[in-house]
Regions:
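Juxtamembrane "helix exit" motif at the C-terminal ends of alpha-helical transmembrane segments
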Residues: 70, 74-86, 237-252
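Hydrophobic transmembrane alpha-helix segments characteristic of membrane transport
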Residues: 72-110, 203-217
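Alpha-helical transmembrane segments
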Residues: 208-225, 252-254, 284-285
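Non-cytosolic segments of integral membrane proteins
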Residues: 16, 31, 106-203, 237, ...
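Alpha-helical membrane-interface segments at transmembrane helix boundaries
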Residues: 57-66, 97, 101-104, 162, ...
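Binding/recognition "hotspot" determinant
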Residues: 1-72
Length: 289
């Protein structure tokens, strides 16, 4: 009877140990690939990220938004002229410089609207340059490597009792699911930011048309701040990845494999949390809303 119990126990141990090793091996491959892809993704301009989407957004902006911006520009500058006249006692105190000022502001507004796309792309080109320089300075490997920790793991697991092994198997299964969730979160942050950039740039001529208006100018100014926030969000993401890379380098020295794995999970959750916060932080820095 004892022989059967021992055989059954060993069989369960082998099955649980095999399941644990299977769950842990390659667990971080998807997260590592996604983290490594962060620098590539955020270091690209809207045109380089997906040329087809870029061309579609450019066409929509030029064919639909620019005419609307022209109408808005005419309304804004007409209101501006009326206010300038009203402020000067209904033409009783009008000076010639007022008309020159209005003509200059109108010309500047037209110039801004006609060159909106170049201005917007210039913001992201500048942000790309900043990210490229930051990546060159940081240059850290952010891949999680637990191969050293798992080298002698299987013999140690076989020495454990059945109860703790069941607990470890459940933990390894849960950690594997968590890693896939983290992979999806990182994917959402990266692709969500790029889609937001395309959405914001598609309507660029409309807020830029109001840039020179006295009362409407806040629309254009806030739009520019939003562009800068989106651009420099990439720099904040690079900093997050750099901090994450420094943290994960110390994992290989951990002797307790489960502690090392849970530490990996904690660092990855922390990375996802900070990535989600970069958008609001960038907007707070540039006072965009």
């Amino acid at each position: 009877m004892d022989f059967l119990i021992d055989a059954l126990t060993n069989w369960l141990k082998e099955m649980l140990v095999g399941g644990i090793m299977s769950n842990l091996s390659g667990m971080f491959d998807s997260v590592n690939s996604q983290v490594a892809d962060i620098s590539v993704q955020i270091g690209q301009t809207p045109q380089g990220w997906n040329p087809d989407i870029f061309n579609m957004i450019h066409t929509l902006s030029e064919s639909i938004m620019v005419p609307i911006a022209g109408v808005l520009l005419a309304i804004v500058m007409t209101i501006e002229l009326i206010q300038m006249i009203a402020d000067r006692n209904n033409l009783h105190d009008v000076d010639t410089w007022m008309l020159f000022k209005w003509v200059f502001k109108s010309a500047a507004a037209i110039l801004i609207v006609t060159n909106t796309w170049s201005i917007v792309m210039g913001v992201f080109d500048m942000a790309q340059s900043v990210v490229a320089q930051a990546s060159g300075i940081i240059g850290s490997d952010a891949a999680i490597d637990i191969s050293q920790v798992m080298a002698d793991m299987e013999p140690r697991l076989m020495e454990m009792d059945l109860g703790p092994l069941i607990g470890l198997w459940v933990q390894s299964l849960f950690i594997g699911i968590t890693m896939w969730a983290m992979y999806i979160c990182i994917f959402i942050v990266l692709y969500g930011r790029m889609i937001e950039i395309y959405l914001v740039t598609s309507v660029a001529p409309v807020p830029m048309a109001a840039m020179m208006g006295k009362e409407w100018g806040g629309m254009g100014q806030n739009y520019l701040r939003s562009l800068l926030a989106l651009g420099f969000q990439a720099f904040l993401i690079i900093v997050c990845v750099a901090i994450y890379a420094v943290l994960v380098q110390n994992i290989a020295t951990e002797e307790d494999v489960i502690m090392a794995i849970w530490t990996c999970v904690g660092y990855t959750v922390l990375l996802c949390f900070t990535l989600f916060k970069t958008g609001s932080l960038a907007k707070a820095i540039f006072q965009a809303h």
